[in-house]
Amino acid sequence: MKEYDYLIVGAGLYGAVMAHELKKKGKKCLVIDRRDHIAGNIYCEDIEGIHVHKYGAHIFHTSDKKVWDYMNQFAEFNNYINSPVAVYKDELYNLPFNMNTFSKMWNIRTPQEAKEIIEKQRKETGITDPQNLEEQALFLGGRDIYEKLIKGYTEKQWGRKCTELPAFIIKRLPFRFVYDNNYFNDRYQGIPVGGYTAIVEKMLEGTEVRTGIDFFEFRKENPEIAEKIIFTGMIDEYFGYQLGALEYRSVRFETEVLDCENYQGNAVVNYTEREVPYTRIIEHKHFEFGKQEKTVISREYSSEWSVGMEPYYPVNDEKNNALFEEYKKLAEKEENVIFGGRLGDYKYYDMDKVVAAALDRLGEFN
């Protein structure tokens, strides 16, 4: 008999939900993680009494009551509402695109005026069959919104010109003809009081966890340690990139403590000009309405991913999705290995979808 029922590779949200639920079923699990901490990309670090989102802003939002109730077992959530602001040439615009945005951009007041301007600008482009992201954005929203709020930010995010990006990245532009800066449409939203790391700690209570462990080295030394493996790392890395590497985007952060109480007055400020090198600045204290004397900001830079870097989100274009389908076929042949999570499923998951995917998968276990 093997030492563990499950070896769970990755102590992020997917792995932690799996470990918590399997422990309730009486299974013995070992959770390992390559990083020196748990909680994956939702890890929060305490700096100056502020919970710093080390791997970028994470706002929990969902319309799934089952998932909301599940998460509330582990933490109380505050009433934070995500209302980012965009800066373009020293002008501030509210996001998402709503009447506050349009009023600032065109000095108008009514939804009818906004609709007429957008429709006029759309027609002026002459585009009927968009062939790339630039044409798609112009076709959907006209030139002003594209030039000021989409173009530079998107090019920084993807590291390519909008004319070189596929049109399907922007399926629609979420225009709201009301004065409402709430970014999400979901019924439930908030930040866990005490930060995200505390949630994962609670999920992993009573389960053996080892950090700073590389799975591939560990497997060589302990090939028979568990009956089954739950792998939440990169699916292409698991198979030694034998079909070629899937593409990801990476993100780099410059975090600093500032000797002031309030730097930008908002948790998230996007910089939409191409000439500004970072995509946004996060001021972490505002997620929890902090009153600390100092503040912590993180400048976020998007970058190409290469082997050895942290993969943040998959590049889900046709080429990469087709390659993932080939890896999926290999995965189906792997006995006693379950792939899941953002990297295992090669999917850009919001946190609620990660939790839902883990709970759904657990429903298949005997």
Predicted regions and their residues:
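Dinucleotide-binding Rossmann-like beta1-alpha1 core, especially the glycine-rich loop
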Residues: E48-K123
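Active-site/ligand-binding neighborhood in enzyme catalytic cores
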Residues: K89-Y93, M99-E227, T232
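Short, well-ordered alpha-helix to beta-strand connector turns
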Residues: Y4, G26, T207, I225-E227, ...
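Glycine-rich FAD pyrophosphate-binding loop
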Residues: H20-E48
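Short, solvent-exposed loop/turn segments at secondary-structure junctions
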Residues: L13-Y14, D36-H37, N100, E155, ...
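C-terminal segments that line or cap access tunnels to active or ligand-binding sites in enzymes
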Residues: E227, E237-F365
